[in-house]
Amino acid sequence: MLRIGLTGGIGSGKTRVADKLGEWGAAVIDTDAIAHALTQADGLAMPAIIQAFGPEAVRADGAMDRAWVRNRVFREPQARACLEAILHPLIGQETQAAAERAVGSYLVFVVPLLVESGRWRGQLDRICVVDCDPETQIKRVQNRSGLTESDIRRIMDAQAARATRLKAADDVIVNDGSTTAEVLLARARSLHQSYLALADKHDRHGSTEAGPP
């Protein structure tokens, strides 16, 4: 099956694009959603997170306190490394299992830190970046969350630079502040049609056996 990596900075609109591709028949695996599931109450990652970070890292409902952990990992590089060491192997296992079950015209992995990880390129046929300017990212995230501008900028600073993402891209969907919902839909549909053609060619000529990292 043709494998597409879909990425973009926070607030870029990659989830909206992924949702549309899924509606049109692609199999979509969202690694951020997997990470959320792992850190919910009784999630597979929670015992190790509690052991590493203590009870302060857990909300009253038993899920990981994302705000507390986010502040901790921004302050302490070793805390970030510890969290990644807990989550990344579990995310990889769950992603692999989901890919093996996937049914669709082609497979889309939604990976927020795809470019940063450096491990995905060899497992993908193409990388698609949903791109927008930083100010638009900030406005969108402020509108949907309680994060302050400084918090958002810290998250953005921890992600790959815009130019770095664009350099890694095989395909780009522009979703800046002037992009209407109709225009974004048209751009996503055009890309979907090109992926269908590539998927047909890919399936006729065989596919790789490797799974995601």
UniProtKB/Swiss-Prot annotation:
SUPFAM superfamilies: P-loop containing nucleoside triphosphate hydrolases. Its EC number is 2.7.1.24. Pathway: Cofactor biosynthesis; coenzyme A biosynthesis; CoA from (R)-pantothenate: step 5/5. ATP binds at residues 11-16. Coiled coil: none annotated. It is found in: Cytoplasm. InterPro entries: Depp_CoAkinase (IPR001977), P-loop_NTPase (IPR027417). GO terms for molecular function: ATP binding; dephospho-CoA kinase activity. Residues 3-202 form the DPCK domain. Keywords: ATP-binding, Coenzyme A biosynthesis, Cytoplasm, Kinase, Nucleotide-binding, Transferase. GO terms for cellular component: cytoplasm. Gene3D superfamilies: P-loop containing nucleotide triphosphate hydrolases. It catalyses: 3'-dephospho-CoA + ATP = ADP + CoA + H(+). One of its GO terms (biological process) is coenzyme A biosynthetic process. It holds the Pfam family CoaE. Belongs to the CoaE family. HAMAP family: Dephospho_CoA_kinase. Catalyzes the phosphorylation of the 3'-hydroxyl group of dephosphocoenzyme A to form coenzyme A. NCBIfam families: dephospho-CoA kinase. This is Dephospho-CoA kinase.
